[in-house]
From Swiss-Prot:
Species whose genome carries this gene: Helicobacter hepaticus (strain ATCC 51449 / 3B1)
Subunit details: Binds to the N-terminal domain of the chaperone ClpA.
Superkingdom of the organism of origin: Bacteria
Protein name in the entry: ATP-dependent Clp protease adapter protein ClpS
HAMAP family: ClpS (MF_00302)
């Protein structure tokens, strides 16, 4: 039985969205308490989770804040960049596509 255009279109619409990691990068100027605050306010991390991720960023140079669809990852990246700029920090945030 041949697929109709509707069935083919429906199959295309049901694909899983690509997921993206949002990462914060370490620098020598951004205060660790500010990074923890970002993690709690923007990424909904608990205080313990925020502390653990902040230490990972400090020790390893970067840390994963969360995994989201593209639009959400980009929005969170913009929010973090804006908050860092408002507070005078050079905090960098990037996204990476999940394999």
């Amino acid at each position: 039985m041949a697929h109709t255009a509707f069935e083919t279109s429906l199959d295309t619409l049901l694909e899983e969205p690509k997921m993206y990691r949002v990462l914060l990068l370490n620098d020598d100027w951004t205060a660790m308490d500010f990074v923890a605050r970002i993690l709690m306010e923007v990424f909904d991390k608990t205080s313990d989770e925020a502390t653990a991720i902040t230490l990972k960023i400090h020790n390893d140079g970067k840390g994963v804040c969360g995994i989201y669809t593209y639009d959400i990852a980009e929005l969170k990246m913009q929010i973090v960049s804006q908050m860092a700029k408002q507070h005078g920090y050079p905090l960098r945030v990037i996204t990476e596509e999940m394999p």
